[in-house]
Amino acid sequence: MLPFLRAITLAVLSALALSAWAVDASVLKPPAGAKVAIVVFEDLECPECASAYPLVWQAADAHKIPVMLYDFPLPRHNWSFDAAVWARYFDTQDTKAYKLGNEFRQYIFANQKQISRENLQQWIQRFATEHEVTLPAVNDPDGKLAAKVKADFALGQQIGVEHTPTIWVISNSAVSPPLVEEVKDREQLSQMMDDMLKKAEPSAAIKNPATKAPKLKKSALNRQEKQNQGVKP
């Protein structure tokens, strides 16, 4: 192909890709009653997701906005899909806006370096025991929880997610550029939230935002931050 034709072709393809991205990203909307939300596509086996997790929730809590988690277990990770299905199970064991499921995700991220496909079940049992939850003999026998994980993954593919974490700050009228793989600090997210809040259209306030963006325990946050820095708690 001649150089100038190749350049034109690449330009057209890039324009089409950007157009498709904008259309696809528009499917992301805050939950009812919220003007702004954080959307996170994550993989429980992903080290960058573990690093981003406390920053996301701290920023969300500071701004009193909800976090919308989507499972995106990467095929190269051999236990992340099973962990995501178990997180969905723990979601069903608590009526407080998935509080127990989010605590399980936090727990997995905090212990991620020690978890393997071979010992994952032991960590799940330990978490269940600590939280006085009885585990089923067979998790998700009808495949409904796995189907939800797969649906999240399919949505991610639809809107162009390829890496984890991929994070958007969205409003009811706009979508930020995505943060992909790396979240440097809480201020980065906070600035994006402030920008989205300015762009958002008026909306009814969430009566109890803490139920949608639950606070992480300080001890757990400190433990997570130390582990991310390579310091034992």
Set out the residue ranges of the language-model regions:
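Positively charged n-region of N-terminal signal peptides that target proteins for export
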Residues: 1-7
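Bacterial N-terminal signal peptides
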Residues: 7-19
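Boundary at the C-terminal end of the N-terminal hydrophobic targeting segment
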Residues: 20-25
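Extracellular/periplasmic catalytic domains that process cell-envelope and extracellular macromolecules
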Residues: 31-32, 60-62, 79, 158-163
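Short active-site neighborhood of thiol/selenol oxidoreductases, capturing the structured segment around
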Residues: 32-46, 67
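Structural alpha/beta surface segment adjacent to cysteine/selenocysteine redox centers
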Residues: 44, 50-128
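C-terminal cap of thioredoxin/glutaredoxin-like
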Residues: 53-54, 125-233
